[in-house]
A protein has these predicted regions:
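Short aromatic-glycine-(Arg/Gly/Cys) micro-motifs in beta-strand/loop hairpins
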Residues: 30-57, 72, 88
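Negatively charged, low-complexity tracts enriched in Asp/Glu with abundant Ser/Thr
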Residues: 1-22
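Feature targets compositionally biased, intrinsically disordered low-complexity regions
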Residues: 21, 45-46, 81
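Short, mixed-charge low-complexity intrinsically disordered segments
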Residues: 77-90
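Compact soluble domain cores
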Residues: 1-3, 69, 86
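A short, charged, amphipathic alpha-helix used as a generic interaction element across diverse proteins
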Residues: 51-53, 62-79
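Charged, amphipathic alpha-helical segments
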Residues: 22-28
Length: 90
């Protein structure tokens, strides 16, 4: 595992969207490190028109690899339910 200094961050994320009954829904998955070196998989989801997310869930893992594997599993499950990657152009 790579040791991070105070100002370095490692991050991995996936942004998914889908249309449900005429409304856009989003599902964000992000991996980040905690202050104690654990990896956190954060799942944030809700409706696009809402000012706050419907729910924010955090799962803690001892390694980046475990968190990344879980991110891939959740991402694939959401894609099976109709979520598609959010594509942005600059």
């Amino acid at each position: 595992m790579t040791q991070l200094t105070l100002f370095q961050t490692a991050r991995d994320h996936v942004s998914l969207v889908r249309m449900v009954k005429g409304k856009m829904r989003y599902y964000l998955l992000a991996i980040d490190y905690s202050l104690f070196g654990d990896c956190i998989l954060e799942k944030i989801y809700g409706g696009m028109g809402n000012s706050k997310p419907t729910r924010v869930l955090r799962e803690y893992y001892s390694s980046w690899i475990e968190a990344k594997e879980r991110l891939e599993i959740v991402s694939q499950a959401k894609k099976k339910k109709g979520y598609k990657p959010l594509v942005t152009t600059i």
